[in-house]
């Protein structure tokens, strides 16, 4: 290089190397302007459409084949029904996808690969073809059409309503369901018409859990019963031993099949689901037993529960088996009883003994009639409570109702009174037994005065109720209390029936009979007095001697007549009096017709003086008797009218019912303060302050009257 060269010369480049193309000022200026922004934004700005097209041409990604066959029940959805997915992220709606924008006619593909998927999800945990949403006929209900989700066996799976979906199965989806795919946090809400939504539950989630738990218990119970039957059969076979050919030709009894199908059990439950207690009562009446529930309590306060149990006498293949149904309820005692009856009906229906066929019932009725309605195991000699007779009556009634000739008993007033007396005697007997049990308990708890102080204290605690009765005494007391309660209820029922069946009594009829009898006796007494006076008057003329009545003083004669009347009243009955009156009348007439007998002159004079007096007295008696009869008839008529008026007044009182509503309206409408109150003057002060219209004189008078009081 020479010094004369004034400028620096750049070295020459090989011909194969080309100089870089000059960049446009816009491209050079862009990084300087957006240096503060994110790097991705800068890269997106730098890359042009030509560069992206060049990349796509260089990188060729071929979509894999979708291995999915459309089922035969698939169909196209109705265009009028719009279904879509709402995509939520962190509780916010970020996007939505309409299912009508699908590539296929009947299904939607959900996945991560763009060319072959309808709904594109970019999370790395989502498979290329993740799942299929297929539209078609509803396979479960066969009543409509809808969408079904089909998991394609993805690596991280899918969840519907927070439950993992099984692979390669069609699951019916409803409007309102939510979906999650892979490990993505985005939630897809399925939106559509209300007709496709799931029906609401008829119970709460807690009740659903209880139902599920109950079904599990029933399944365990059925399994345990089946296992017990198998064990019993094995035990019987082991105990049989060698038959020696004695049972040759005998037909084996068919085994009782235990029904375990849930759908069949639901159909059969319709018989006793509405009223299980009534269905169970029919079973016990048919078997001839009493339905006795046993109750017990558990816990206290908010943990208090009622436990109800009942023992079921079940005969399976000729073998008596005892099952116990129980139920625990925290609501009430009645609910526990109903639930226990429902469980008992289910157990009996499982072994097909709750409802027997008509042929078996007819054979059972004939067998009972042949055995005089007694069971084969009944022993009257050992029965001391009369329970066997009651069971026999129940069996007899049930058998007669089954044969068609139902026995109807009509109770009368006398039969009801007889039954009432018997129930009262039963109440007294039950109370007597209870008193004897209580007295025996008290006697066993008596405290000895001697001994240790600690022993006395413990006995005192036992006496006060610390220990209580033993189990046997409690059972006896409970049994007699139940009998007492049943007898008491029966007595109350019979008392009501006796009041209803009591013959009607006509008011005034008894009074009329008593008054008529009293009037008859009074009339006969008066006639007796008349007869006695006649005899007294006739006594002097019977003998030839002088008259003793004339010699007696005037003061003695009335007393003697009264004494004679009293003696005659005591000695003579009404029938005898009537006969004597008739005889006296006949004898007087006969005496008048007889010829006269010669008598002394003094006697004739006395008789001649007394005869007009006797004739006048007889006419007076007849008039008085007729007057008495008229008075009696008038009194009877007045009494009948009075009784008729009283009956009419009572009928009016019954018909005219005073309505309290009218009285309240009348009281409310009245302007008086305290109207309608009996002691109004004592409870209410009716004084009112003076009005402006009153004169000054009245106001001054009132001020002077109440000065110093107010």
UniProtKB/Swiss-Prot annotation:
PROSITE patterns the record matches: DS_RBD, FHA_DOMAIN
Coiled coil ranges: 206-240, 409-440, 471-502, 613-661
Domain FHA: 108-165
Annotated keywords: Coiled coil
Composition bias type Polar residues, residue spans: 538-560
InterPro entries: Cell_Proc_Reg/RNA_Proc, dsRBD_dom, FHA_dom, SMAD_FHA_dom_sf
Feature: compositional bias, Low complexity: 15-25
Residues in the signal sequence: none
Protein name: Uncharacterized protein ZK632.2
Organism field: Caenorhabditis elegans
